[in-house]
């Protein structure tokens, strides 16, 4: 066997071992250097045995192997403290130090042992060594029967706040059980009682054989600390439900609901209130709280299913009333016309008088500084058509106590927080209010002050244009067939008939304004709000409310009202009273759709409030129906 002697020919440079690596590089750095050196010598065809011998005998590799062996022994060795009283030992050393010589080392040792950090370290060492961190429980008595159920003693400190739990009697066993735990209450925050727990004693008094009312009386008479002895439920309920927010579409008063399990735990709410649903485990009774006061504990409200069932039962229990709900609008309109007292001096003389009024009105519809802007949607014929066609429908719905609006609608509407992004279209602004409250004047002033930002949609009509009118400016003039096609295709937000002609505002007309980057302002009758509530338009509804009658008598002493009989007629006291009553009915019937309410006591103040409300609607977070922002929902 031949042995190469090339290893003896290695120069000092070739024999140079790699520089010890930086400790921060770790084992990966060492292996990387080793591979580099091996590849270098391999390329030179150097004898590997000599190289490997020198490498394995290098001091830095020997030290690394010693550290590895030490770690392995440390890993296999079970750690046992040398002493469990290191703190006592340190105190004994401190007592002996004064007897020793006063060398600098003795002084330094005294300072170290007296330092707070050193004392804390030794105390922690003794605690771990003695295993004082493990709780010591007393031994169980030997005479406990195997059949006895485990009991829990719960102590709660009751102040002026309610406990936040309801109880019930088991129908078969007669046991007193915790029926439900109210979210946010004292019991829920303690985490010690759960629905289904069996009460055995309250403050040392056995509840066996007692009625729930008697147990409630014991709790009501107790103050300070209340001690419960309970048999816990085998598996405490775990709720994984997400928080849901809804808008109430009806009024609810727990005091008037005979079916509520606990009247005191009920949560009253009004139409339009935003509720936070925190518990839907019960199919009939949910737990919720108002977002206006999230600090209080939740209350019981009927579930969506239960309220719909109540609505159906109430609807079918009412007597059939075709004269209020199903009377034709044409018959109602004729009765209303017959009931109006006509002053012959104020009746329009002929159609020319009406046309002359519209012609004068058309001149006022051009506004702007320097440049003329036309304000569409204010023609007298359109306003009279809307008022005449819709008043009868509104009157019928308001007179019917069991209106179909409340009978078939969902009692809750799920909502989410929405903020319009700068790249999105503006939200449609809808103004609602009784006739004479100033909706049209507010809309006119708003558009007139900034026509480049605000605009009304151009309505449609089937009548022929007059000589001074232009298609697409005052109206979109279409045939009756085209208009009816838009109606049946649900493309009209509102429509009606006046003097044999159809008038209305289409969805496309609103989109035309929004596509220009402007804010579309329109007024609707309350019953037409639903047709505009789509995810494309995302309307923000503002209710213009009149002040009290005495304030209106002062602010509207020179104002005039427009009717189909009177071109201009001053307000009478009965008109003001009727306006106030109609506003109350609108708010009661359709208030759940109103996002904002403005009292028009002073026109300039109301216009300023309107501008502020519109700005908030376009720029700030608002509650909107969840269907408007959900990507999986078709509007």
From Swiss-Prot:
Q: Sorted alphabetically, which keywords does the UniProt record give?
A: Coiled coil, Cytoplasm, Repeat, SH3 domain
- Compartmental location: Cytoplasm
Q: In which tissues is it expressed?
A: Detected in the retina (at protein level). Highly enriched in the retina where it is mainly expressed by rod photoreceptors; detected in the inner segment of the photoreceptor layer and in the outer nuclear layer. Also detected at much lower levels in pineal gland, cerebellum, cortex, hippocampus, olfactory bulb, heart, liver and spleen. Expressed in the CA1-CA3 regions of pyramidal cell layers and in the granule cell layer of dentate gyrus in the hippocampus. In the cerebellum, expressed in Purkinje cells and throughout the granule cell layer. In the olfactory bulb, expressed in mitral cells.
GO biological process: any one?
protein localization to synapse
Q: Name one Pfam family in it.
A: PDZ
Domain SH3, chain residue ranges per copy: 241-311
Q: Where does the L27 domain start and stop, copy by copy?
A: 23-79, 86-136
Q: Where is the composition biased (Basic and acidic residues)?
A: 1-16
GO annotation, cellular component aspect: adherens junction; basal part of cell; cone cell pedicle; Golgi membrane; lateral plasma membrane; presynaptic membrane; rod spherule
Record carries keyword Nucleus = no
Q: Which residues form the PDZ domain?
A: 153-234
Instruction: Name the predominant localization.
Output: cytoplasm
Ranges for domain Guanylate kinase-like: 426-615
Residue segments, region Disordered: 1-23
What sections of the sequence does the record tag as coiled-coil? 567-622
Q: Which family does it belong to?
A: Belongs to the MAGUK family.
Functional description taken from the UniProt entry: May play a role in retinal photoreceptors development.
Q: How does it assemble?
A: May interact with GRIA2. Interacts with MPDZ. Forms a complex with CRB1 and PALS1. Interacts with FASLG.
This chain's protein is named MAGUK p55 subfamily member 4
Per the UniProt entry, what species is this protein from, by scientific name?
Mus musculus (Mouse)
UniProt gene name: Mpp4
